[in-house]
Amino acid sequence: MRLRIITACAVAVSTAAALAPPAQATPKRDRFDVVNLVSDVRGKAAITDPKLVNPWGLAMGKTLWVSNTGTGTATVYSGQGKKERTEVAIPGGAPTGQVFNRGDGFTVKGKPATFIFSSPSGAITGWNAEADPENAIIGAFTRGADYKGLALAETDDGAFLLAADFAGGRVHAFDEDFKRIKLSRSQFRDRSLPDDYHPFNVAVVNGNVWVAYALRDPKTGKSVAGDRKGFVSRFDLNGRLTGRISRVGLNAPWALTAAPRGMGRKYAGALLVGNFGDGTIHAYRGGRHLGALRGADNRPIKLPGLWDLEPGTAATGGENTLWFSAGMDGGKHGLLGVIRPAGAKGSAPRLPGADNRSKSPYGGY
């Protein structure tokens, strides 16, 4: 099947202008604050949620969905981290990557999956509130696969999924019926990389497919951390290799997204890469390393166990923010928060209590 892309339904920079910070707050140029919002550890963040253990993939619909690898669930948050009532169990357990599906494909029990999840068990599952409000449903299963990341795009023939198989060292594709698409030996593959670097994540950012590669320990099946231990390759939306970014700053990279416009002129629209290996976040433009995101103290931001990064919206977090998820203490605990320009406030107000929630018992997803 030839993949001809018309649009990408994954990470993109918001086209809306970021709201200006309040007059009393003067953001420091190219410096950022980290705000902890939710954790399973009491006192670590403003909100305590015992389900938030080793939070991995993030997906933004009307609200923010979080894949909790440690509890086999997906939980939902709005505003500045307020937990919604929706809570979904993921069959196959340990959800990793996650995408929001706007289309009519990828049906589960006759309904299009609103959110789709990948799992190290080789399962890809979908959730629709009408099909089953409390459980995702298995749509595809690949024996022996270890899916660490997931992306969604659209083609002339419909949408398709891309899943990073960390065990097999390949990117797999699935059509809207959750059936595997047979790819050529060169599609979504960087054959010049060392054999022990495997796809750790895949994302669609700024109209390109990006694949993050990490060094895989064959004995444990886990990623290996270390300075410049990682690659990030760029493909067009037909799977043809078109480039590779600098290895400067890479350390078991996983998160891939575009910097929101509200993060300032230097970074707006740049590719942001978050390292699982050392918890730092680096920006790249045209393949060139722009530097690490730094805190107000001018030190590189470090978030131990960093997994995903997701731009905020006017309703959820703010248009000048970047959501992050991290599996603290070696994945035994979890942290969800935002990164925003130093001195700035979130451009979205904290939502009031339950009276303002969606009338749906499953929240506004």
Tell me the role of every PLM-derived stretch.
Residues 1-25:
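Secretory targeting and sorting signals
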Residues 24-365:
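Sequence/structural signature of beta-propeller domains
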